[in-house]
Amino acid sequence: MILADAKSKMQSSVESTQRAFNTIRTGRANASLLDKVLVDYYGSPTPLKSLANISTPDASTILIQPYERNTLNIIEKAISLSDVGLTPSNDGSVIRLNIPPLTSDRRKEFVKMATKYAEEGRVAIRNIRRDAIDSIRKQEKASEISKDESKDQQDNLQKLTNEYTSRIDALLAEKEKDITTV
């Protein structure tokens, strides 16, 4: 039970790290760059993707077509104020975002950001392991499981931790390759 719970939490950490990686620009247009953009729609922060169709007609352009034409200006303002680092171009019916090629300094910055996200994922996995080990030790102390069972569960937990940490490392290597490929 403890191992299954830890496994699902570790899987969530890997998925969270993957989502964080998706927000990092790689020099190619990707609609997920706008996932964190919230638009002030009638006083409430609303995700951009629920107000507009977002597409990538080519490798260097993101096209945003609002479902309602009157939301063009507030969408443009939200993108300008967000931290995506792209300047919107409003032509009256759609908003275009041109993705400039990344400079080598910008690529290094994005690799650092990816490394930071990966480390946060690894720390989360280690914290899950620590909490699970505490639970196993409590069971052992309460004589619910034997010392051998406790040791086996802790060994299995360490194997799980290694597996999920290596998944994050693989995701990081893939993201670094994406970022550094010109």
Swiss-Prot record:
- By its UniProt entry, which Gene3D superfamilies does this protein fall under? 3.30.1360.40, Ribosome-recycling factor
InterPro entries found in the cross-reference section? Ribosome_recyc_fac, Ribosome_recyc_fac_dom, RRF_sf
Say if the entry is tagged with keyword DNA-binding.
no
One cellular component term (GO) for this entry is: cytoplasm
**UniProt record, GO biological process:** translational termination
The UniProt keywords, alphabetically, are: Cytoplasm, Protein biosynthesis
- Where mainly found? cytoplasm
The subcellular location is: Cytoplasm
GO terms of molecular function: ribosomal large subunit binding
Q: What does this protein do?
A: Responsible for the release of ribosomes from messenger RNA at the termination of protein biosynthesis. May increase the efficiency of translation by recycling ribosomes from one round of translation to another.
Q: Which family does it belong to?
A: Belongs to the RRF family.
Q: NCBIfam families this protein is in?
A: frr
Q: What is this protein called?
A: Ribosome-recycling factor
Lineage summary: Bacteria, Bacillati, Cyanobacteriota, Cyanophyceae, Nostocales
Q: Tell me what gene encodes this.
A: frr
